Amino acid sequence: MASFFDDDQPSNLTEFSVSELSGSIKRTIETAFDQVRVRGEISGFRGQHSSGHAYFSLKDDKARIDAVIWKGSFSKLKYRPEEGMEVIATGRITTFPGSSKYQIVIEQMEPAGAGALMALIEERKRRFTAEGLFDPATKQLLPFMPKVIGVVTSPTGAVIRDILHRISDRFPVHVLVWPVKVQGEGSGDEVANAINGFNAFQPDGVIPRPDVLIVARGGGSLEDLWSFNDEAVVRAAAASAIPLISAVGHETDWTLIDYAADVRAPTPTGAAEMAVPVKADLEAQLAGLAARLAGAVNRQMDHRRQNLRALARALPSLDQLLALPRRRFDEAASGLGRSLELNTMTKRQSFERAAAKLSPDMLVRRLVERRQRVSERAALSDRIIERLIERQKANLGRIDATLTAVPARLKAQTGRSRDRLDSFSRRADSAVINDLRRARSTVSAHDRMLQSLSYKNVLMRGYAVIRGQDDRPLSRAAGLEDGRAIAIEFADGRVSAVTGEGDKASPPPQAASATTTPAPGRPNPLPKSPKKSEPPAGQGSLF
């Protein structure tokens, strides 16, 4: 039994324990792969861990390796890792002796070329579109005349100077600048925080809340503009309650914030022009409306004045009105002298008779009665005069109120006229745009129909067109003389040719085939060889 367990064949291999072997493998691998660059696709990325580290895998079509980015290295990355993103990672290989596993500790990471960045942009665009962040129905209209404009850009670049200069030229308003980095590490977070910060302002706060926002940056490469493709920036722009204008790069540069913004400007200067109108144009429009209003008022006054004159002409003249009263007055004046004499005589007689009957007591009573009657009439006259004065004051008050309300009504009418004019202008612009679109669609359809019906499509399949000297197509051989110049048109050009002699007396191939068709089952007879023609007399043979 002892010989069964004894090793009769000694070995020269070194004996390791498991921990010794694992440690040796760890030292060998970490020494050999102390600094490596690996290209692969990110898989299993779920964002940063609560500790700040990031854990995921790099894979290709044949293998997979675990990867980790420590918190300090993650904050320095220019491009944040995303699921499915193809990257080139730089780092070192480490192993875990306790579980026989290895991983790469990534220190630097960048996309694997512009193609990877474009693929990532397209993937984000599809995802954001599915979420409704780019829905045109959520776009806000820009205010016609903003009082405060917020600008998110670099405070030291030429962009902010161009924006301020353009706004000052067109319509000077209050501008708030939120300084941010527009490229590099952390720039995307700064832009998103700036948009959210402007939206957090209160309308009646110490710092006024902007009526419109401009997010601007100058031109650059895809890597320079990458901050404006950041998910945080896109979501902040889409969620902004303040209308937002994106002006990133040149007209040919498109970033994801352009799709999320309410309006996209081709340049920062164009964004300033969209934000404010031209003050001189507004003043000219107001002057024109004021002139039209003054003209309308003058025309109305002239019309009323003409009506008044027409009514005045319809009234009789003053002489006609006073003719009859004057006649009556003259007649009365002529008989007044006699009437006065008779009346005086009658009154004197009556007075004498009454004086004979009067006594001192009666005279006193009559005098008291007359004085009392005069006092009552004087009081009544005072009350009547006071009522007349109050009535005239009320009439004057109503007239004053009417005259005071005339400017307000004219101002309201001016506002309504201005609103109607703006509405008509917008409807006219919309109608012109729709007509242009329909015309462009009609022209495109006609062009496609012409292309499909062109005979050159037939030439491309191997056919040809024979044209005469007048460049008209020839469709029959009849009437075509020998020696006539013709042109043969192929798909790639034309060649010239001359018609030669042909057997015009021979029947067409169809007729000949119809008359010589053999019976079924019999072989086709061989054609007879033509007889040799004899040369004319007196002419030698060449053979």
Curated annotation (Swiss-Prot):
Predominant subcellular localization, coarse grouping:
cytoplasm
Query: What is the stated purpose of this protein?
Result: Bidirectionally degrades single-stranded DNA into large acid-insoluble oligonucleotides, which are then degraded further into small acid-soluble oligonucleotides.
Quote the catalytic activity from the record. Exonucleolytic cleavage in either 5'- to 3'- or 3'- to 5'-direction to yield nucleoside 5'-phosphates
Coiled-coil residue spans: none
Name of the protein described by the UniProt record: Exodeoxyribonuclease 7 large subunit
Q: Which NCBIfam families match?
A: xseA
Origin species, per record, is: Allorhizobium ampelinum (strain ATCC BAA-846 / DSM 112012 / S4) (Agrobacterium vitis (strain S4))
A GO term from the CC aspect: exodeoxyribonuclease VII complex
Keywords of this protein's UniProt record, alphabetized? Cytoplasm, Exonuclease, Hydrolase, Nuclease
